[in-house]
A protein has these predicted regions:
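NTP/phosphate- and nucleic-acid-binding module
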Residues: 1-37, 41-582
Length: 582
């Protein structure tokens, strides 16, 4: 069961684009005074922003719009492309201030519109041939959206939808959407007691005890894997002076997203990124070429101001921990170090059952620093590192940062959604700005290349992804609540239940006994709702035969094993970081 990414399919993109126009046509019929802003295709389908005056859409209004859309689709009008002059366009849309604003932003010359029946809209296209092709659609939700995304502007109404070629494809996608709702990390995070967010600290997650267990496991695993690869770990200040951020360039380009404070008549800022701190560590001592590569890792907490309307659980926050590492390398070490990073990424993502794709972003057309020769060599090194790591990659021409090319790593979760988490960014800028040097073999001082890289990205966001990826049913090694031992009778079997629990805790497992005077079914259901990885039921048979009956979270079937067999099974699952179903 996977959600479809509309943008990955050219035909599906056209179909959804045309369906957005069909929706706008239906809205115009139902609300003749409607004014329209834009209606783009997005990965989840399409949306259209509209001004309906005093009309505030309700959930039931979407059904009315759908009914009108079905009439339009049944009529099957052709979708016709036309070219008109800018002057004619201004005349055609003179009653719609939002379209006038768009038109005034266009260069002089002809403008394309697309027409279907009585409805016409500004659009570059392309579109499908007829609206009849858009009959398999669903309007998904509606929300508010500021015009041009500016909170100082008027609030418009946004309606989302999606369209497919066939009814079966639509139904499958809607089923996947329902599954995604059940897996919503905000919902599961609350039910499982993992995290909360207080009105007193918006965008700043508070991790609860079980959430801290999960977080600590992820961070310990990160430290273990990086230690194997020769990383050294640092911790840099959370607040540093304005002068540092001016030196790094963040003050010029990122000031509006930074939290600042005056201390002893001197301006400071809470760090939005960890990079400058790593550069201070590098410059704290002299370096020879023999010291390189130098791999500095930091699980560093950063703060970035985000608009309140953009905040979303663990996915969009104002403070998070970035699993940064900054590698200082010589040019001839670059390819090998990137290859090692990719191998590390592969090892970590595979543990979570997360396939991924790599995208190489190359030199922008203008505004970049460094010579073309350096860029070409750097891009080649990144590409060759992918090849030598046995990884395919796609090229994203011109999308590199001004200071260097990069590899973006996009993971795919169990619902087919793509998340950009890992990055390997080559930086030719900051080492120059901070005057970082090393003494080369010939005795001359040279500037190292710096690699910024993350694997999890944001630890908090990665936790949110994992909650939804696993639907809360974490593999045993990762689960905050691994076992609950449930005696059939709260008194008769409690001694044996405690024996089983003690055997589990002796192996370092997290286990409790639920011996409350409640019905067995109630206690089992509660453990299922809490997504305890294994529920272990013990009664007369288990007590007499030294066995346990185990049921895995999210499963209906149970199995009975000897206690020794069960303990060996559980230990192997933790040691091997086994994924369920593997």
């Amino acid at each position: 069961m996977e959600l479809v990414n509309v943008l990955e399919n050219e035909h599906l993109s056209m179909l959804n684009h045309s369906c957005a126009h069909m929706m706008a046509q239906a809205v115009k019929r139902l609300y003749p005074n409607a004014k329209f802003w834009v209606g783009p295709v997005i990965s989840e389908g399409f949306y259209y922003d509209m001004d309906l005056g005093d009309v505030k859409l309700k959930e039931e209004d979407l059904a009315k719009i759908e009914k009108e859309m079905k009439k339009i689709a049944k009529d099957g009008k052709r979708i016709v492309r036309e070219e008109i002059s800018k002057e004619d366009a201004l005349e055609m849309f003179k009653e719609d201030p939002y379209k006038i604003d768009l038109i005034n932003g266009f260069e002089d010359g002809n403008i394309t519109i697309y027409r279907q029946g009585e409805f016409a809209d500004l659009c570059r296209g392309p579109h499908v041939e007829t609206v009849k092709m858009c009959k398999n659609f669903k309007l998904l939700k509606h929300s508010g959206a500021y015009w041009k995304g500016d909170a100082n502007n008027k609030m418009l109404q946004r309606v989302y939808g999606i369209c497919f070629d066939t009814k079966e494809e639509l139904e499958a996608h809607l089923e996947a959407l329902e599954e995604a709702k059940k897996r919503d990390h905000k919902k599961l995070g609350k039910e499982m007691g993992l995290f909360t967010i207080s009105e007193f600290a918006p965008g700043m997650p508070i991790f609860l005890p079980d959430g801290m267990i999960l977080r600590n496991i992820l961070e310990q695993y990160w430290y273990q894997e990086h230690t194997k690869e020769g990383y050294q770990f640092i911790k840099t200040p959370i607040m540093m002076s304005k002068e540092l951020w001016e030196l790094s360039g963040h003050w010029d380009h990122y000031k509006d997203n930074m939290y600042t404070s005056m201390v002893d008549d001197r301006e400071f800022a809470i760090k939005p990124m960890n990079c400058p701190g790593a550069l201070l560590v590098y410059n704290s001592t002299l370096h020879s070429y023999k010291d390189l590569p130098l791999r500095l890792g930091e699980l560093g907490q950063v703060h970035r101001h985000e608009a309140s309307g953009a905040l979303n659980g663990l996915f969009r926050v104002r403070t998070f921990t970035q699993d940064d590492a900054h590698l200082f390398v010589t040019p001839d070490q670059l390819e090998e170090e990137v290859k090692k990073v990719l191998q590390l990424v592969d090892r970590i993502y595979s543990v979570f059952g997360l396939p991924y794709e790599i995208e190489l972003s190359t030199r922008p057309e203008s505004g970049y620093i460094g010579s073309e020769e350096i860029w070409d060599a750097s891009e080649k090194a990144l590409a060759q590192a992918c090849v030598h790591a046995g990884k395919e990659y796609k090229v994203n021409p011109g999308d590199g940062a001004f200071y260097g090319p990069k590899l973006d790593i996009h993971i795919k979760d169990s619902l087919g959604r793509v998340w950009q988490c890992g990055t390997v960014q080559l930086d030719m800028n900051l080492p120059e700005r901070f005057e970082c040097k090393y003494v080369d073999a010939d005795g001359t001082k040279k500037t190292p290349i710096m690699l910024h890289r993350v694997v999890y990205g944001s630890v908090e966001r990665f936790i949110g992804i994992l909650i939804e990826h696993f639907g809360g049913h974490f593999p045993l090694w990762l689960a905050p609540r691994q076992f609950v031992v449930i005696p059939v009778h709260h008194e008769k079997h409690v001694e044996y239940a405690n024996k089983v629990c003690d055997a589990l805790t002796a192996l370092g497992m997290r286990a409790t006994v639920d011996s409350r005077n409640e019905k067995l079914g109630y206690r089992v259901r509660e453990a299922q709702l809490q997504k305890v990885t294994y529920q272990i039921v013990v009664g007369d048979g288990e007590q007499e035969n030294n066995t346990v009956t185990i049921r895995q979270s999210g499963k209906k079937d149970s199995v009975t094993l000897s206690l020794d067999e069960a303990l060996a099974k559980f230990k192997a699952e933790v040691d091997n970081k086994t994924l369920f179903g593997k």
